[in-house]
Amino acid sequence: MPNGATRVTARRRLGGVGLALGVVVLLAAPACNDDSSDDGEASDSSAVGPSAPVELAPDEDLYALAEDFQPGEPGEVIAVQEVEGVDVDGTVLRVLYHSESIEGDDVAVSGIIVVPDGDAPVGGRNVLSWAHGTTGIADKCAPSLDPSGAGVGLVEPFLERDMVFVATDYEGLGTPGRHPYIAGVSEGRGTLDIVRAAIALGDRTGASERTVLWGHSQGGHAVLFANQMASDYAPELDVVGTVAGAPPSQLPLIAAALRDSPYRYYLGMTAAGWNAAYPDADLSLVLTPLGIDLLDEVDEVCAGELGAAWSRYEYEELITNDPNEVEPWATLLVENDPGYEVGASPVLIIHGENDEQIPVVSSQLLVTRMCEIGQDVERRTYPGQSHAGVIGPSMPEMLEWIDARLAGEAAASDCA
């Protein structure tokens, strides 16, 4: 990972203007898995109230505060700064907030909160927690840093509904430590704790506990885990619906499918992320020396550049053992597979039938599994749509589904 000096220089160069959330960048790549281990569900976390975070000017370096901060509870806000120059009908805040690692350590996570203009209604505003797709593992890939993001099209429908829009970067993206890519517990905690952060800001956001979770690709995986974890990890939140777009699932199947895929660099990213999250996940058990050397690029560049780097080599040059056949990797593939526990809310799964990254059959198998355990779930597929291309065509139906959940209507289910 880049050293502290490199990280701070990059952040100061990006500055505070032109952020525009970086949300679209988050959609481009598939998600990884997370852990559904007992550690993720047994945490005794509690609600947080309004706090007194450090207030920063737009040109100050918020991320530097993640290097040294006072202990706090999940969701408490460490620092906040208003972001100028973003063309949305609301106020954009960049935040640094407390969350919890898989091991239970207090970690600082960055993200974005967008607050609609005007006064909040009686009872507070509903919250939409957005979980982004794969951007990379390097600090510079954190969406809240991105000056060219064009997420206005995603944000505006929720601002029009007077909802607070929150978007986590996830643990280790923009902040110290390697990002635990595809580690469900870490992703889920970050996704829930930024809702707590919005609530902790009190009248500044007017956020209530009523929450909808939405994510695509890696983010689809993240919100499925957040939904599974919510009742135990964040019981004060009222999660009413979860929308998972093209979520990575059936991880053992996907790991095998990536063997001859141009997206096989996801194997390297996942190996790096799980090695960061799980001390026993020895890289040499799954990666060749060349594959391990290429992880230097994982820590320096973002997803698009990683694809070009890994595509120069054949699978056999990078992978020494099939992760399905060596421990603890085989177990981690299962533990980080979503859909084994009933979540707090009904689930809508969206998938393009021409998805080139996450096989569309995987979400059908996921629905079958979720039905077997009693999870209310509906799956909608879109003919001719790709991994990221499905987002636009599915948006009107998704918004209708969210509106119905917020209105208290019962959700349809594919389960007999």
Question: What residues fall within each predicted segment?
Answer:
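Accessory cap/linker subdomain of secreted extracellular hydrolases
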Residues: S51-E55, E60, A66-E67, G245-G339
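Short beta-strand/loop motif that positions the catalytic acidic residue
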Residues: G343, L348-D355
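C-terminal motif of bacterial Sec signal peptides marking the signal peptidase cleavage site
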Residues: L27-A31
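C-terminal catalytic histidine-bearing segment of alpha/beta-hydrolase fold enzymes
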Residues: A330-T331, Q357, Q364-A416
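Short, surface-exposed "cap/lid" segments of acyl-processing enzymes
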Residues: I102-E160
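Alpha/beta-hydrolase active-site loop
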Residues: Y181-D203
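Primarily recognizes the serine-hydrolase "nucleophile elbow" in alpha/beta-hydrolase
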Residues: R196-Y265
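Catalytic-loop region of hydrolases
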Residues: N33-A120
